[in-house]
């Protein structure tokens, strides 16, 4: 492929990505949460991913959602904006500062305390205490212990529940086999596990830093 054609192709993809991100509108509280996240360096979802999360929640009519990786609350605000009146978000983070900032922004946004619970602790330990087959959607953001969190998702999800892994492609690093840092390896292995497991029907979407969406089929494997 001629270099100028490749250059135009790359430029076109960047333009499409930028347009997709700008399509999503963030309200004042989402913008404030994002600004807070930038100050503390929390890995929050992009506007495009946040809007996608809201879309999935609305489409699935999910009333029980687990978010692993609260961050500054950006993701939680998007999720809650799509949940029905009787829905509850359980959001988990290992950093107390993240949990505090997220709680503050939820309160500022006048979200009823009955709509969410924020849990702080070692992620895999907290997840292990959640009830079996009780959630319609699980969202995973961190790469640490990703394999174990995917396995726990089997247990947490109701039949035909959805798993979403945010930042699944590490903004392209996962697709590059020369990238051998721990995060890229963990995410690459996580995608492989889901792809090769017949219990999941999955797709990878190039929005934000990459999103993997998987439907738990709850089938008996011979």
Residue ranges and their predicted role:
Residues 1-137, 144-164, 168-222:
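A short alpha-helical cap/connector motif
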């Amino acid at each position: 492929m001629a270099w100028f054609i490749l250059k135009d192709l790359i430029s076109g993809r960047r333009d499409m990505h930028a347009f997709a991100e700008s399509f999503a509108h963030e309200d004042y509280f989402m913008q404030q949460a994002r600004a807070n996240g930038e100050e503390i360096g929390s890995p929050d979802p992009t506007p495009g991913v946040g809007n996608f999360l809201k879309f999935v929640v609305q489409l699935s009519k999910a009333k029980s959602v687990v978010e692993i990786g609260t961050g500054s609350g950006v993701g939680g605000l998007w999720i809650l904006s799509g949940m029905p009146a009787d829905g509850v978000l359980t959001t988990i983070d290992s950093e107390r500062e993240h949990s505090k900032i997220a709680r503050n922004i939820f309160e500022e946004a006048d979200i009823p305390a009955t709509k969410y619970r924020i849990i702080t602790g070692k992620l895999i330990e907290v997840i292990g205490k959640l009830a079996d087959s009780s959630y319609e959607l699980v969202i995973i953001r961190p790469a640490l212990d990703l394999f174990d969190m995917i396995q726990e998702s089997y247990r947490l999800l109701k039949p035909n529940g959805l798993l979403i892994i945010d930042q699944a492609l590490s903004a392209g690093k996962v697709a590059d086999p020369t990238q051998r840092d721990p995060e890229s390896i963990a995410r690459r292995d996580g995608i492989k596990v889901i792809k090769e497991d017949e219990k999941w029907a999955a797709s990878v979407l190039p929005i934000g830093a990459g999103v993997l969406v998987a439907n738990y089929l709850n089938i008996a494997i011979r």
